[in-house]
Amino acid sequence: MSSKKRTKRNRAGDEYKEHKGRSHPRRKFLPPEEPDVSRISKVAGVNQLEELCDSFDQPLHSTAVDACGEEHSENESSGYVPAPQRTNAERSEKMLLETPEGDVHEFSQSGSVREPLMENLNAPNTTRSEVKKKRPSKKSSSDSSVNSPSSVQLWCPNKLKRSSRDITELDVVLAEFEKIAANYRQSIESKACRKAVSAFCSAFEDQVTDLITEVQELKNTKKKNAKVVADIKKKRQRLMQVREKLSRTEPQLIKLQKEYAEVEERRSSLRQVVQFLTDLKELQQDYLDYREENPRKKVVYGASSLPALLVESRRILQAERHFQNINRKLEYALEVQRGKLAKEH
């Protein structure tokens, strides 16, 4: 059983590689010994569906091939595709794209438009030309749906704050991947395939969301770094200006400090003089009060009174000198007057 399963999986992988190498769905060319394409319309509907399903690519998904490779190989070896499986394959290969104007276009996953089965069998050439004509409409509609702000969902975690300006390619990829994965998951009937697809989708979404978070954190860090650099630059310029101003005002500061020291010294000396004068005035008032109370007592001068005696002696000496000067002037005036009188007589 294991060898049969391995051969079936290898056969399914080879067929998947052959279908993956094709960029657009082609028509099969039959060998000369097989019947012509024009005879296909006469065959039963089951054989027509088999030929049509073989002409389209398999879904390009690794999990779908690995998990469902056994079923694909069994169906291909038997040469018959059941109806539910055909409808699911057709449903998985279709994708709806809605433009901002409200038009809805239906495309297959391989990039071609699904035409009705009978038209595909009866007129294959016309179908191919219609596919080529309708292909630009898919690009324009997909571009408009991606570029339109309403079609892109912004993934915003709880820790980070994001705005419409922070939309990146990863957000677009994540939104489109979720849509495609949801459509593809609905088209699968097997539970194992659904689990595999869900696991792959969750892992891919986790990786993309981690990348989005890291990119947003990097942007925020760059913004903060730019702000810090700008603040440092401003503060550095301010520091240079302050240094220049300090160098210019330093001589003035030294001069003002000297003047302040002189003013403080004068102020302190003035305080001392005022205090000394107030004390001397109080002492003199006390002495006068004492002399009024005791007028008969002699004044006794002690060692502490020497400064006062010196001041008093200086005052007395000055008065004596003043009187001597007056006496000399009077004597000189008398002598002059006597000389004049003598000359007259």
From Swiss-Prot:
Residues 1-10, 19-29 have a biased composition (Basic residues). A motif (Nuclear localization signal) lies at residues 222-239. One of its GO terms (cellular component) is nucleus. Residues 142-152 have a biased composition (Low complexity). It is found in: Nucleus; Chromosome, Centromere. The keyword Coiled coil applies. Residues 1-37, 64-153 are annotated as: Disordered. Pfam families: CENP-U. Its main location: nucleus. Probable component of a centromeric complex involved in assembly of kinetochore proteins, mitotic progression and chromosome segregation. Required for maintenance of sister chromatid adhesion during mitotic checkpoint activation. This is Centromere protein U. It comes from Gallus gallus (Chicken).
